[in-house]
Amino acid sequence: LYDMADGHLILKAMVNDGLAPDDTASYLTGGIYTKDRFNIGYGKVEVRAKLPSARSVWPAIWMMPQKGPWPDAGEIDIMEHLNHDRFVYQTIHSRYATTLKQKDPASYVTVQVSPEKYNIYGVEILPDSLVFRVNGWKTMVYPRLEEGMYAGKTQYPFGEPYYLLIDMQIGGNWVGPASGEDLPAEMKVDWVKVYELKDALED
């Protein structure tokens, strides 16, 4: 479910009270993704968005690989927000961090925000690190390990073609059971900017 108003993309989370009679789901959510349409390798992604505060609602801005299994091929969570939290999560997933549960370097950070205001969530995908930002402020650097038994794709699978997802979800083990208590809810996206890393293109 989505709408456009005043140049903003609006992604919705709603109770399915007859809006989609042929859909048996109790709730309906909106989302967009660039899979098989647009790839991002080394570069920078920024999204200016305003988030809902609603029970069991889970808006996210994230990236997944075009090819490869999860979590070995990686996942980059530029922003995830849960319920009525006044902070967001920025997280990476890989075989090293998720399957092997290695905690050095740290794979996530929480960042205080005012979700009801527009904030800019971003990540720089570089050959040697991921750099996360909120409103231009550096929040976490996830470096590529150059030595050790897990150095390489196991720890740092990033830089391969990834696609971007911006979506709303309702319910789950992390955010809690689905609830229509605070619905409908909306995530508003002002703009999305993607930059390619010039040096990587020239290699």
Q: Where do the protein language model's features map onto the residues?
A:
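GH16 jelly-roll
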Residues: L1-D203
